[in-house]
Amino acid sequence: MTRIKRGYIARKRRKKILAFASGFRGAHSKLFRTADQQKIRALVSAHRDRSKRKRDLRRLWITRINAAARNNGVSYNKFIRYLYKRQLLSNRRILAQIAVLDKNCFSTIINNIIE
């Protein structure tokens, strides 16, 4: 059986990984083995944090809606319950944007729902 040295294919693979790690600090961008490990770690973190971002943004929207609702004398819990009761549940992201950008519109929404 003949020996396979993998010449340019191995070089191409290493260059690709080092190019991915080019923005990393210190040896993590210079040495292949550490760059390879850091690439795996970076991709794991990116995958985990894509799910975490969804959770964090939902918490932020709920906090903003709660703050705006309490300024109008209603808790978040009651506000959402009335929205469900009237079958008007809108997107929490949209409600949070309305609460932040247009306070008068949000207060009219609350007044119309809670009657």
From Swiss-Prot:
It holds the Pfam family Ribosomal_L20. One of its GO terms (molecular function) is rRNA binding. It comes from the Eukaryota. The keyword rRNA-binding applies. One of its GO terms (biological process) is ribosomal large subunit assembly. Its main location: plastid. The keyword Plastid applies. GO terms for cellular component: chloroplast; ribonucleoprotein complex; ribosome. It is found in: Plastid, Chloroplast. Keywords: Chloroplast, Plastid, Ribonucleoprotein, Ribosomal protein, RNA-binding, rRNA-binding. Binds directly to 23S ribosomal RNA and is necessary for the in vitro assembly process of the 50S ribosomal subunit. It is not involved in the protein synthesizing functions of that subunit. Belongs to the bacterial ribosomal protein bL20 family. This is Large ribosomal subunit protein bL20c.
